[in-house]
Amino acid sequence: MPGIVVFRRRWSVGSDDLVLPAIFLFLLHTTWFVILSVVLFGLVYNPHEACSLNLVDHGRGYLGILLSCMIAEMAIIWLSMRGGILYTEPRDSMQYVLYVRLAILVIEFIYAIVGIVWLTQYYTSCNDLTAKNVTLGMVVCNWVVILSVCITVLCVFDPTGRTFVKLRATKRRQRNLRTYNLRHRLEEGQATSWSRRLKVFLCCTRTKDSQSDAYSEIAYLFAEFFRDLDIVPSDIIAGLVLLRQRQRAKRNAVLDEANNDILAFLSGMPVTRNTKYLDLKNSHEMLRYKEVCYYMLFALAAYGWPMYLMRKPTCGLCQLARSCSCCLCPARPRFAPGVTIEEDNCCGCNAIAIRRHFLDENMTAVDIVYTSCHDAVYETPFYVAVDHDKKKVVISIRGTLSPKDALTDLTGDAERLPVEGHRGTWLGHKGMVLSAEYIKKKLEQEMVLSQAFGRDLGRGTKHYGLIVVGHSLGAGTAAILSFLLRPQYPTLKCFAYSPPGGLLSEDAMEYSKEFVTAVVLGKDLVPRIGLSQLEGFRRQLLDVLQRSTKPKWRIIVGATKCIPKSELPEDQVEVTTLASTRLWTHPSDLTIALSASTPLYPPGRIIHVVHNHPAEQCCCCEQEEPTYFAIWGDNKAFNEVIISPAMLHEHLPYVVMEGLNKVLENYNKGKTALLSAAKVMVSPTEVDLTPELIFQQQPLPTGPPLPTGLALELPATEHRNSSVRSKSQSEMSLEGFSEGRLLSPVAAASAARQDPVELLLLSTQERLAAELQSRRAPLATMESLSDTESLYSFDSRRSSGFRSIRGSPSLHAVLERDEGHLFYIDPAIPEENPSLSSRTELLAADSLSKHSQDTQPLEAALGSGGVTPERPPSATIEEEEAAGGSEGGGVAPRGELALHNGRLGDSPSPQVLEFAEFIDSLFNLDSKSSSFQDLYCMMVPESPTSDYTEGPKSPSQQEILLRAQFEPNLVPKPPRLFAGSAEPSSGISLSPSFPLSSSGELMDLTPTGLSSQECLATDKIRTSTPTGHGASPTKQDDLVISAR
């Protein structure tokens, strides 16, 4: 709430902050009330002892004081727990209760003095030990309470409190000159107060001119940021809790929406179809990522002995002590003759720690050339090393490790980069620009780079490349230093780990992508804070405080695991009403105009290391490890502070190092993320990526049997998850890796005996499932197509992230021509392991049908007649089977294949080759365009003797083809040939294999004005397969692929 006003002055404490102090004092006074009552009324005193009589009189008076304190503290507790954060009317009488409690405190102070007098007179001469001990305890307790209250008053004292009250009273009247004078006085007083706090914070450091300037600049920055803001520190804590709950609620709401492209949230960042994962299967990409991990060791070493001991608290101290000359051998030289060390401590611990860091990592080819431990405002420590293995000269800059570094961080105004000959406005973080200029000046004065490149001419150090690295403050300084050094070193590279968010202007940020690679881990706070980001954060914080109707103590306690209940308002209408009614109560909080800060962004191309959040297990169960992924981040996406307990922990340098390594570990274990139109990874926020793939076998539905060979398709009616689910709640039932119902073993075996293609795919799917389990691949499902959703309808579940298009016509098996039997199969999964190519499996199994090529030409199979007559839409599969059985007994039954001369064929048939290419084309991930006929009207190759060409099209087909000519973006992609297929990506890349609009929305290609039967007839994809040899004009089997 706003600061409480007592004695006509505002204090930096709210009336709802007194709950815990009042409870503590109430319990303390209650305890002493019970003890003193037992001592006074339960013991017998000697009437001849003066000390005992004085104790009884003093104790009775103190009992009354204790009783008064208890009553006043109960009233404070009751009042403090009423109302909301900004709803202060129920607590208006708090100041009067405090007046009463302070009056009682004065009486306590008098009784404490009387107790001291009694102790000086009777403590040595009194023989009653009980009386002496009780009196001594009361006196000590009284003085502890009094001193605590005095210290609290000093802490919550606001020097500008009187001016603030006057300004608020004046603002209620018409604005005049007095209002502006009071506002100016308030801002100056706040700046002076902040400057005083900074000086107290840095009381042990020597003050220089630059440091004094930093004090003034940061003080005015804080005064500007908290101007006219009537909140107390506890309000910020409660606001953070509410803001975190709001962010989580928004993410869940986004996942519940049907009209968005967000598949999941990893580390608070949305994952969409356009999210680019690092393709670690690409050798060039893998080498680049390993280079990023390698140079993180140089950035970590720059922190010297504090970080070395933090990483190795036990053996690290022994390693440093063994190398320190001041501890063991003062006369022993510690470094090579060419090493320069500036302003290290007497033992040289920082330089020794840097050296030990590389030795522990077996990096013996790294030579330290120069080490500067000089630490001041705008002057950051750094070191220069030569890496002979990589043939690089490395400049590593230390991050924030001292209060002086914090002053450099807080000087966040925009400063022009001292670089000439560029286009646009290049601005940077002022503190880091000054630090980069200092390092550049130091390198030139000491000729450090000349020494490094001339370190060992025999090894060719003259031709080594230059690398600049840093973490946190060092990352921002390294990026700006790269701007200053790039004119002399055009091949320079920079690696910035956890850089600050408000670092570079947009023009400079775009240019830095040519040579800067930045790394951000998870929900790290630092890459998301700058002046512009903090201003937006302040507005969000005030907004959640305005909308909150709960008491502050309940909000803060609700953030703990004891009471994990959301304190966000449930009824949005009620919240809006309450907020509008409180608008006039605190207008200064709600109408604050944000300052016009120049937007600054993180530098370079950003590698964002994200991870999922496994469900919390019970205390007796082992917690699962999160799975880490690396994606390419957008510099402008880090514009919002994500509130999380990990936002500070994930900024530590050794935690960043662990996160980078875990990406490689997960990749080596086979934990990749691959999404396509028919293969969708379950959201890592819901399902932990573990090797255990749980297949839930569900019973078949009751009803009439389906036609032979028709794959079972049931409606997928599950709703999209709205919150993070546990692993058991997110287990998927798979049918050949398709989301839907699972065929029973008997039904699967029966279908396999009748259909060789289904037999082939069933064995392939089993092998793929076993290998995916052994490779710890992520759970993957194929989007099922229910009989209540069209071919272009995607279920909007959280596990897939697709949007659902409701109300489309039901899908039935509608045949347009009197052709052969239909094979209804599920498409194979895009190969993630090259050894499991669906094309390879098909070609190997084609030996079963090689006899068709040897004994029966394609012309005989197709027949020499014209186009087969069209079949009425009302025809069923049973009628077709009956017709097929009456047309000559030479036609082999469906699914029955004979062997040629008792052996298998040696090469596949052209029809199976075409079918294999079609299967591969379903999972084409390239960006080529296609016509409608390329995928929806696939025919057999034209033959000079075959009349099986394009037959007359129905009106529905002609209208669709005509529409596809004018709307080329609505058609699927072309089939991808196996030989020219792109390398599989290890990142999530969803191929838009279904029609999309210009806005990314899924569209229905069904022409208007057609019946459902005619529309569904166009959804069939045909390819021809021979049904046997020795048959006269044979019916062509339609192979309908249901992408599920």
From Swiss-Prot:
Catalytic residue positions: S472 (charge relay system), D524 (charge relay system)
Coiled-coil stretches noted in the UniProt entry, renumbered to this chain: none
Transmembrane residue ranges: 23-43, 61-81, 102-122, 137-157
EC number(s) per entry: 3.1.1.116
Record-given protein name: Diacylglycerol lipase-alpha
Subunit field text: Interacts (via C-terminal) with CAMK2A; leading to the phosphorylation and inhibition of DAGLA enzymatic activity. Interacts (via PPXXF motif) with HOMER1 and HOMER2; this interaction is required for DAGLA membrane localization.
Keyword Repeat annotated: no
UniProt catalytic activity: a 1,2-diacyl-sn-glycerol + H2O = a 2-acylglycerol + a fatty acid + H(+); 1-octadecanoyl-2-(5Z,8Z,11Z,14Z-eicosatetraenoyl)-sn-glycerol + H2O = 2-(5Z,8Z,11Z,14Z-eicosatetraenoyl)-glycerol + octadecanoate + H(+); 1,2-di-(9Z-octadecenoyl)-sn-glycerol + H2O = 2-(9Z-octadecenoyl)-glycerol + (9Z)-octadecenoate + H(+); 1-(9Z-octadecenoyl)-2-(5Z,8Z,11Z,14Z-eicosatetraenoyl)-sn-glycerol + H2O = 2-(5Z,8Z,11Z,14Z-eicosatetraenoyl)-glycerol + (9Z)-octadecenoate + H(+)
GO terms assigned for molecular function: hydrolase activity; metal ion binding; monoacylglycerol lipase activity
Principal localisation: membrane
Function: Serine hydrolase that hydrolyzes arachidonic acid-esterified diacylglycerols (DAGs) to produce the principal endocannabinoid (eCB), 2-arachidonoylglycerol (2-AG). Preferentially hydrolyzes sn-1 fatty acids from diacylglycerols (DAG) that contain arachidonic acid (AA) esterified at the sn-2 position to biosynthesize 2-AG. Has negligible activity against other lipids including monoacylglycerols and phospholipids. Plays a key role in regulating 2-AG signaling in the central nervous system (CNS). Controls the activity of 2-AG as a retrograde messenger at neuronal synapses.
Presence of keyword Transmembrane: yes
Expression sites (tissue/organ): Highly expressed by principal cells in the hippocampus. In embryonic brains, it is present in axonal tracts, while in adults it localizes to dendritic fields, correlating with the developmental change in requirement for 2-AG synthesis from the pre- to the postsynaptic compartment. Concentrated in heads of dendritic spines throughout the hippocampal formation. Highly compartmentalized into a wide perisynaptic annulus around the postsynaptic density of axospinous contacts but not intrasynaptically (at protein level).
PTM description: Phosphorylated at Ser-784 and Ser-810 by CAMK2A; phosphorylation by CAMK2A inhibits diacylglycerol lipase activity.
InterPro entries xrefs: AB_hydrolase_fold (IPR029058), DAG_Lipase-Related (IPR052214), Fungal_lipase-type (IPR002921)
GO biological process, one term: retrograde trans-synaptic signaling by endocannabinoid
Family label: Belongs to the AB hydrolase superfamily. Lipase family.
